[in-house]
Regions:
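Short, charge-rich amphipathic interface segments used for partner binding and complex assembly
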Residues: 12-65
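Short, charge/polar-rich alpha-helical segments
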Residues: 1-16
Length: 65
């Protein structure tokens, strides 16, 4: 079982990672607007991996509660 401080720290870290992913999504929209689909596709693939990692971290926290 994770202690409360560790859970809090992990949630803070996850919030930072979510904010970073949101900025990356904005970049992807810009690439699409510029018809740079290859770059947008690559950025979206990176975001997908980041979101899968976040989902795993959420599942770990939930299992520790």
């Amino acid at each position: 079982m994770m202690d409360k401080q560790l859970i809090f720290s992990e949630i803070e870290s996850m919030i930072f990672d979510i904010e970073t992913a949101i900025k990356s999504l904005a970049n992807s929209r810009e690439y699409i607007a510029e018809d740079d689909y290859s770059r947008a596709f690559n950025k979206l693939a990176e975001i997908e991996i980041e979101l899968q990692t976040l989902a795993g971290r959420v599942a770990y926290i939930k299992s520790s509660l």
